[in-house]
Amino acid sequence: ASEPAPACVVMYESWRYTTAANNCADTVSVSVAYQDGATGPCATLPPGAVTTVGEGYLGEHGHPDHLALCPSS
């Protein structure tokens, strides 16, 4: 399993989208880990970035559980 993203990366969920905000000093690459065990695609966020990282809770996988760090390439 991948390790959780640092606390400075904040996840917001709505019915339609799951969004991540990078409040860290460094660029991070994260994906959404859903409660059903599925993982979304990786998204790279520079410091201060806010981006959609997955579907919301009405999507195929339901509620997101947490943001996970993606392996660095």
UniProtKB/Swiss-Prot annotation:
Classification via Pfam families: A_amylase_inhib
SMART domains the record matches: A_amylase_inhib
InterPro entries named in the record: A-amylase_inhib, A-amylase_inhib_sf
Molecular-function annotations in GO: alpha-amylase inhibitor activity
Cystine pairs: C8-C24, C42-C70
Key words, A-Z: Alpha-amylase inhibitor, Disulfide bond
Additional remarks: PAIM I inhibits alpha-amylases from pig, dog, cow, horse, but has no activity against human salivary and pancreatic amylases.
UniProt function note: Inhibits mammalian alpha-amylases specifically but has no action on plant and microbial alpha-amylases.
Protein name, entry field: Alpha-amylase inhibitor Paim-1
Species annotation: Streptomyces olivaceoviridis (Streptomyces corchorusii)
